[in-house]
């Protein structure tokens, strides 16, 4: 397989679906969007490939308050949230927060402990999976678990739904 084979063999006869018909490093379309869209102060759309700090990301000022970064992954026991209610799958593949042994030791967490995972968006109680298979400073929770929280009470999730911890804020694009 060769990506863009026809374009590579004859770019004149097989233009790409860009304004110039070519691979664009500078995007006229993104430049126009950046000039015409109403963006929040911390939202950036750049016509050139450029690093832009993400919100809720590694360099967010809230990191001083919440030092561990949380990431989600597709879990082997579910397809998104489908099959999240199947008992045998829940037993075979329990919902856990992955944490590096260095971070776990600093917090007095042992494998299997129920831990409180929280940030400014929400909180959950979930079992800890202490493993060197995740980097120090990073935690991970499989996505797709069903929410089990009293949303009219304490709002603490007991099902391991990563969505309780996200801002639900879309990126500018």
Regions found by a protein language model. Give the residues of each.
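Long, contiguous, secondary-structure-rich segments that constitute the structural scaffold
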Residues: 81-83, 87-98, 102-173
């Amino acid at each position: 397989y060769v990506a863009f084979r026809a374009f590579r063999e004859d770019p004149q006869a097989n233009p790409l679906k860009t304004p110039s018909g070519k691979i664009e490093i500078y995007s006229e379309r993104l430049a126009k969007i950046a000039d015409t869209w109403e963006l929040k102060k911390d939202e950036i759309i750049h016509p050139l490939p450029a690093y832009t700090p993400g919100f809720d990301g590694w360099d967010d000022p809230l990191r001083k308050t919440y030092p561990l970064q949380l990431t989600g992954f597709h879990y082997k026991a579910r397809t998104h949230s489908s099959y999240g209610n199947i008992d045998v799958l829940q037993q075979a593949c329990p919902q856990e927060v992955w944490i590096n042994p260095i971070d776990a030791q600093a917090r007095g967490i042992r494998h299997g402990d129920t831990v409180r995972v929280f940030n400014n968006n929400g909180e959950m109680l979930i079992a800890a999976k202490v493993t060197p298979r995740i980097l120090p400073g990073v935690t991970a929770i499989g996505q797709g678990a069903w929410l089990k929280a009293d949303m009219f009470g304490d709002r603490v999730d007991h099902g391991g739904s990563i969505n309780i911890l996200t801002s639900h804020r879309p990126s500018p694009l």
